């Protein structure tokens, strides 16, 4: 449907304009496109040229709508920029296809940016198409195109044209998404990203610096569940194939007057829909009812008063953040920080961010240029207003009593009746007054300190005394959590930059950071869109702080300022086990000796949790991605958000809230909500098989005729005495201790047996894996989830979430997978 509409648009333009022979749409191998020259598409719809913004010498290469389609007064901007983050500082820029077929942007004779690095000595040309797509093509001898080597549609900037995609490539895992500009005349990558959700593929989201800012809701039957996009003419189609999953924007193809609908995300995170009309002008459909929800950004942000003055730096009474911040970021960070009283941009173009924790003083030197300072004052006005209300109540009370006294005298109420009525009136007035004072006090505290009360309650639950926080410059030996300020975390991660992002899990994104003392840390930030919440955060913070073992990851502290909830861990240089185990190249690092050592470490960590720690802990989410590896490839168990503490005599419990990862959950936990130490044993058995085989447990789901999962695959080969066939191919050519490998396979199958009672304990696993006592291993029984090649899982009734209740009946009401 979308492609038909685009074809009609192109055909209409062709008939209207005809083709010009005086301009070219092609750059041949060895030719140069320089500043002042243009490539113009065949029917003059788009042009490619170098340009710069007013009052800036920086040179950019971009694709524009041609002038024929714009009013002369139109404030136009390019739809695509090749070097948005790498501007050329002078006018010497040029574009060329070199002798090896590589597409390059040059500064003088030097390579500034290599857009395509695929080498070919064949005939290669660059062509600007009438769709707005810039393609590097390898040509056959007869002049026909052989293949596309590179195209601009695979690298969108802030604008979506018909034919472009939002989603990911199934083969390369490359993501197609829009990223806002940093400022009006600064096209560098900004703070807002519009694209497909990383976890739920049929949802579009806008992220602000990695945080959920807006969501379209689920795509179902050609519509999003949130009506915002549907009602405003944002028409999409969804494609899901083996080669990728993506949304394609089509616009309103039923409107015969319009064509080339575009979507642009601006610097404030607002989606703008624009369409070109046959009257040869562009109309901006910026309707406030159609904007993506999030921060509301005004010329003067809410809660701030602007002043243009020369002020001194905040170095002594605040902090300065990197130049990659926009004014939107700066105001949002100030609002999130209860100690922030003012902010300003550090650069003339409106980027950078300077925060004051005390009011800025007008002591700038004469050499400093005036800046617009935004001072936070709205909340103080509200607090002052509430003070007036309190004073008014105190003044009104005696006046009310005096009026009552006069009324009683007028009606000749005397003696005991007068006293009784007066006492009742005084009592009611006092109750009312105290109630109002209590309410006003809470209101004032809320306005002054934001979520301070909630923070205090959370600190108490974590066992932390706030009075000692500012005195504690070093971590104590009593396992207390260190409290980090939001500013210190921002500084450590360079404002949660993409370069420092290590990955993302069910909790939220994880970043690498560097503290002021030089120590490297990993920072786990609770996402607002995360399925995990405050309970899991507290659970993990408390548990890891109290558990100390060489095979458990160490938590250093947390940050709970305002709405932020972050955990700070020791940094693991080698990421997680799945990073190596399931990658066809990186898995070669894991020889059998190292794999066995990793299994040993996991066993020791689980044995400590189940038997030897101060607390008896069931992890409930043992999997490859939760096994971190330090610089010496020693394994450490992480992610205790779902862990549960058992009493000394407690052996099992049940829950109405089943949470974990499909493929690793034991059958009794998956079906009935029952969990125990044997649940972790099952998960470990699955992980053992993955380590031995080098495959994910669910890697068979595409094979409808084959086994259900890795467990069933190994079980079938075990019954046929073909265990050697399950061993990872990367291990088969190396020197293997086959008896040890076969023993590990058998131990793993014992761990994944259907009945929990049949599975060994982790203490038994230790003796089994080393073959202590020279006892032969028992034969494993049928594994879980095995019933022929395919088996349907029992239906789950999903109801609203209820709190866990250990004494409740065994019924699953909520199923959460991660």
UniProtKB/Swiss-Prot annotation:
Q: What does the entry list as the binding residues for ATP?
A: 502-510, 524
- Pfam families referenced in this protein's UniProt entry, alphabetically: B_lectin, PAN_2, PK_Tyr_Ser-Thr
The signal sequence is 1-22
The chemistry this enzyme catalyses reads: L-seryl-[protein] + ATP = O-phospho-L-seryl-[protein] + ADP + H(+); L-threonyl-[protein] + ATP = O-phospho-L-threonyl-[protein] + ADP + H(+)
One example of the protein's molecular function in GO is:
calmodulin binding
Q: Which residues carry this modification: Phosphothreonine?
A: 655, 813
The record's section on InterPro entries has: Bulb-type_lectin_dom, Bulb-type_lectin_dom_sf, Kinase-like_dom_sf, Pan_app, Prot_kinase_dom, Ser-Thr/Tyr_kinase_cat_dom, Ser/Thr_kinase_AS, SRK-like_kinase
How does the UniProt record describe the way this protein sits in the membrane? Single-pass type I membrane protein
Which superkingdom? Eukaryota
List the Cytoplasmic topological domains.
409-818
Q: Where is the PAN domain?
A: 290-379
What Gene Ontology biological process does one annotation of this record name? immune response
Q: Which residues carry this modification: Phosphoserine?
A: 530, 625, 638, 699, 807
Glycosylated residues are 123, 199, 337
Please state every residue range assigned to the domain named Bulb-type lectin. 24-149
Record keywords, A-Z: ATP-binding, Cell membrane, Disulfide bond, Glycoprotein, Kinase, Lectin, Membrane, Nucleotide-binding, Phosphoprotein, Receptor, Serine/threonine-protein kinase, Signal, Transferase, Transmembrane, Transmembrane helix
Q: On the Extracellular side, which residues? A: 23-387
> Which positions, given as ranges, span the membrane?
388-408
- Per the record, which residues fall in region CaM-binding? 585-602
Q: Which residues form the Protein kinase domain?
A: 496-785
The catalytic site is made up of 621
Q: Name one GO cellular component term.
A: plasma membrane
PANTHER family (alphabetical): RECEPTOR-LIKE SERINE/THREONINE-PROTEIN KINASE SD1-8, RECEPTOR-LIKE SERINE_THREONINE-PROTEIN KINASE
- Family note: Belongs to the protein kinase superfamily. Ser/Thr protein kinase family.
Q: Please give the name of this protein.
A: G-type lectin S-receptor-like serine/threonine-protein kinase At1g67520
- Which lineage is the organism of this entry classified under, starting from the top rank? Eukaryota, Viridiplantae, Streptophyta, Embryophyta, Tracheophyta
